[in-house]
């Protein structure tokens, strides 16, 4: 399908003519996403999301297209935007628009466009409102909460701390000028949010602790079949894909620094070591640092690594992990990139005044006053999505199966979830894993009743306690 009905104009994509290509890749992805497709089949007749109006803010990729079409197959209406200005796959967005789903996503969109699109996914053509949010990084959730606060006290928009906040605050001011209750009305209609990633989850917990969160949230990120698979195994494949596509660098023999040794850092370090890099790790947490050391990685500080390493990867979820003084001391042609959700892990703002030379889209030389150049990938945003196509379909099937289950759970059992941040129960985590195993022809051992009694668990599971660390 390369065109939409003449009266359907509720979308913004780069080129609708790419829809045919996108549809072909979606069909391939479906064969690699067993968990998500099994859930689509299981609930197709019941239609548990009938009546759900979902605002989706998540990378508009081929894999996300399969998620969107699963949600609609289960009865939901959906409006979608990407959660990152560089992560959209234009052919995926075109295919979704051609199917009649409102989508607003263009690879390389401006910050102004980004926040415009994030507003538009809350605006339904019939004047109705979204009742669910599916978020990645928390921007859709943030927009409604911050906007509602600004309705009461516009001074919350007085001091932007970054260029992105400046653009966001301006967008909120403009919307309030035309509709003073735009945010609070939409905020009140939301039943809940399901959050995809570590950074967004941190935001939710902070909002809840401050008493600011206005609806329940399910923390999808901390489902085992998300964080221990998407974050680790997904990054293990997609990080080096992005670095290689961007630079064609020979990784073997280089010193590569991984900043942060959580699940994303673990996968990133494994990937770089598999290509025979000398991998160093920076960490603040002594437990994670000890894990890195026991895996054979050298644990150092950024202050030490800055002038010695060849490749730098941030994956901490923190702020200014690589500062200006670090970059000023780096080698000529050092490669600097980020695989954490937001672009502020690297202090890109501090080097914006220098000369930039675009090598190709999302690959820039930043030229320092002394003539030294570093290679900055995706302008400090997600390198695997900015410079490549993100995680493989198979691992995203686990994450998106969790998202779909979480949407069903919150939408159909809203009364069971007072305002707070929740995780999915263990038996649903195990269900996703079972569905995924089928694709790999794995043979799962069945627990005998006497064995189950011996260790005190049901034959059918769940098999681990809630606090078990995988």
Swiss-Prot record:
Keywords: Cytoplasm, Hydrolase, NAD, One-carbon metabolism. Substrate binds at residues 61, 136, 196, 226, 230. Its EC number is 3.13.2.1. Its cofactor is NAD(+). It is found in: Cytoplasm. Belongs to the adenosylhomocysteinase family. May play a key role in the regulation of the intracellular concentration of adenosylhomocysteine. This is Adenosylhomocysteinase. The gene is ahcY.
């Amino acid at each position: 399908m390369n065109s939409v009905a003449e009266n359907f104009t509720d979308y913004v994509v780069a080129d609708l003519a790419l829809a045919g290509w996108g549809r072909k890749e979606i069909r391939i992805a479906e064969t690699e996403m067993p968990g998500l497709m099994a859930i689509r089949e299981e609930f197709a007749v019941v239609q548990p999301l009938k009546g759900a109006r979902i605002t989706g803010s998540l990378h508009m990729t081929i894999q996300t297209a399969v998620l969107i079409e699963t949600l609609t197959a289960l009865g939901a209406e959906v409006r979608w935007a990407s959660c990152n200005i560089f992560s959209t796959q234009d052919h995926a967005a075109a295919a979704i628009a051609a199917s009649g789903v409102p989508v607003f996503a263009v690879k390389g969109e401006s910050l102004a466009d980004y926040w415009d699109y994030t507003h538009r996914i809350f605006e339904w053509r019939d004047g109705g409102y979204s009742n669910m949010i599916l978020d990645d990084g928390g921007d859709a959730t943030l927009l409604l909460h911050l906007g509602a606060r600004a309705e009461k006290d516009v001074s919350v928009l007085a001091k932007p701390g970054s260029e992105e906040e400046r653009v966001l605050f301006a967008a909120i001011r403009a919307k309030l000028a035309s509709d003073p209750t735009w945010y609070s009305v939409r905020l009140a209609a939301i039943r809940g949010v399901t959050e995809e990633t570590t950074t967004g989850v941190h935001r939710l917990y902070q909002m809840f602790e401050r008493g600011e969160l206005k609806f329940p949230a399910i923390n999808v990120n901390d489902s085992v079949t998300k964080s221990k698979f998407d974050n680790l195994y997904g990054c293990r494949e997609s990080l080096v894909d992005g670095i290689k596509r961007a630079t064609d660098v020979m990784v073997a023999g280089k010193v590569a620094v991984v900043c942060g040794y959580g699940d994303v850092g673990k996968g990133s370090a494994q990937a770089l070591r598999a290509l025979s890099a000398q991998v160093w790790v920076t960490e603040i947490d002594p437990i994670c640092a000890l894990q890195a050391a026991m895996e054979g990685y050298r644990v150092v500080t950024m202050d030490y690594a800055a002038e010695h390493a060849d490749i730098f990867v941030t994956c901490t979820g923190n702020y200014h992990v690589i500062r200006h003084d670090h970059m000023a001391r780096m080698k000529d042609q050092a490669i600097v990139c980020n695989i954490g959700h937001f672009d502020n892990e690297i202090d890109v703002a501090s080097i914006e005044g220098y000369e930039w030379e675009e090598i190709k889209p999302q690959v820039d030389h930043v030229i320092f006053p002394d003539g030294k150049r570093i290679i900055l990938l995706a302008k400090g945003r997600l390198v695997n999505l900015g410079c490549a196509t993100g995680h493989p379909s198979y691992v995203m099937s686990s994450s998106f199966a969790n998202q779909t289950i979480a949407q069903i759970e919150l939408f159909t059992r809203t009364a069971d979830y007072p305002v707070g941040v929740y995780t999915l129960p263990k038996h649903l985590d195990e269900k996703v894993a079972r569905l995924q195993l089928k694709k790999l022809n794995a043979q799962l051992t069945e627990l005998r009743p006497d064995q189950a009694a011996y260790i005190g668990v049901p034959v059918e599971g769940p098999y681990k306690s809630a606090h078990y660390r995988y």
